[in-house]
């Protein structure tokens, strides 16, 4: 039970941290929209946070830039599908950074890899492998007539079964 509690606590901390990163990213986007500030905003925020919270890591200029990109990428989806927000907080920040690097202008692909990571409990190495081997494209290529031949729930299930992530 102790290990279970530790795992739950780690997930809770991760979720809270990601929610903070989301809100900071949102604040940065709003600050930039309301002012004439450029990249100096991120540097200034980074320095302020490091000065106020010297014991906390993760407030480098690079990481704060990722927070802004995190918000920009997923806010496109969140405005259409608000329930997605909760999913975003279920995977580690390091996973998000790789997804952001690869799909900063492709929110649907980014969300696909977030969901696959959650469903399959992928490590960062496994996630990178599936990104590098373009799982998103491969899973969409299974050709069938299941939609015409089977009723709705069965056609979806049959289609899913033909998709091979290792192909």
Predicted regions and their residues:
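Basic, low-complexity intrinsically disordered segments
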Residues: 1-167
């Amino acid at each position: 039970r102790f290990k279970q509690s530790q795992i739950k606590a780690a997930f809770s901390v991760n979720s809270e941290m990601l929610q903070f990163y989301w809100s900071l990213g949102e604040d940065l986007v709003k600050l930039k929209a309301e002012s004439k500030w450029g990249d100096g905003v991120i540097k200034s925020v980074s320095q302020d946070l490091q000065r106020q919270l010297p014991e906390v890591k993760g407030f480098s200029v690079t990481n704060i830039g990722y927070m802004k990109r995190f918000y920009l990428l997923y806010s496109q989806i969140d405005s259409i599908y608000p329930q997605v927000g909760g999913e975003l907080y279920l995977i580690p920040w390091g996973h998000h950074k790789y997804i952001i690097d690869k799909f900063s202008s492709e929110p649907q692909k980014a969300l696909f890899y977030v969901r696959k990571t959650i469903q399959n409990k992928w490590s960062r190495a496994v996630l990178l492998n599936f990104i590098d081997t373009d799982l998103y494209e491969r899973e969409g290529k299974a050709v069938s007539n299941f939609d015409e031949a089977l009723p709705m729930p069965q056609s979806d299930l049959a289609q899913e079964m033909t998709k091979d992530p290792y192909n």
